[in-house]
Structures are given as structure tokens and as C-alpha cells.
Amino acid sequence: MTTAQVKEIEFFVSEKAGAVTGLLMKPNEARVLLILAHGAGAGMRQRFMENVAAKLSNHKVATLRYQFPYMQKRTKRPDPQRVLTDTVRAAVAKAKKEAGNLLLFAGGKSMGGRMTSRADAAEPLDGVAGLAFLGFPLHPSGQPGVTRAE
């Protein structure tokens, strides 16, 4: 098992959204940092997100898990897409400052992955070498379609 330092961080998203928190888990000898957004129903401290970060840490992959503003404020309804993609960009900017010489990847679980891909499709995420998704719904359950894939 690899030893990792865990640090709580805060970063500013926008005047409207305010600041959010994140958890940087950085194992010794890390070479990569994955910026990891949570899904719609559970935040960065949800068991799945913690397990993913811990297992990646064992393979010398650092993670930056972060909250979207609605989860930070403990409201149930996700923020508008613009706020979510602005949060992705703010998380990437913060990760660049924290990463040192680590190679950056970005992604997330479900909605977090989708918002990361939308942010990158609109304008490539600065300094990000690739994207990684942990569950990526292209349509709501029971409603097949491809509009989210376009």
C-alpha cells in the first residue's frame, strides 16, 4: 500500500457560484493527477469516490476530488450546466497549481464525467492530457437517445 498525503483545498468558481472545496490525495512517487468530479446524487466524500481515490493512490495516481456548488451548499438540484462546466474549469486550474510536474487527466463519475467532457468539447481543458469517465450516461434511465452524445 502506498502512503498518500490528503489535503483539503478550496477554490473559487465564479461570483455567482462562489467557492467550493476539494480533496487532493497525493501518493509518494505519483506521476499522474486525475481531476475527479462527482455524480449528480452524491458528493466527493461518497464511498465510491473515496474508494476510487484510494485504489488509484495505491497505483501512484494522485486525485483531486471536488464539489460542485450545489453539493457544497447541500441542495439537491444540480446547478445549471454553465455553472457545472465553470466548476470543472476552476478545478483544472487549481489542479495545475497543485500538481507540480504531474501529468493531468480530468473526468468524473456519471454527471461529473459528462460535464467534464462538455467543458473540454467547448474549449480544451488547459494542461489536461486526456479524459477518464467512471460511468457516463448518454441518456436518462429508460429514455434512450443520443442528444447527450452530440
Region locations from a protein language model:
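Primarily recognizes the serine-hydrolase "nucleophile elbow" in alpha/beta-hydrolase
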Residues: V88-E150
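Serine-hydrolase catalytic machinery in alpha/beta-hydrolase-like enzymes
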Residues: E10-L103, R118
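Short, hydrophobic/aromatic-rich segments at coil-to-beta transitions
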Residues: T2-E10
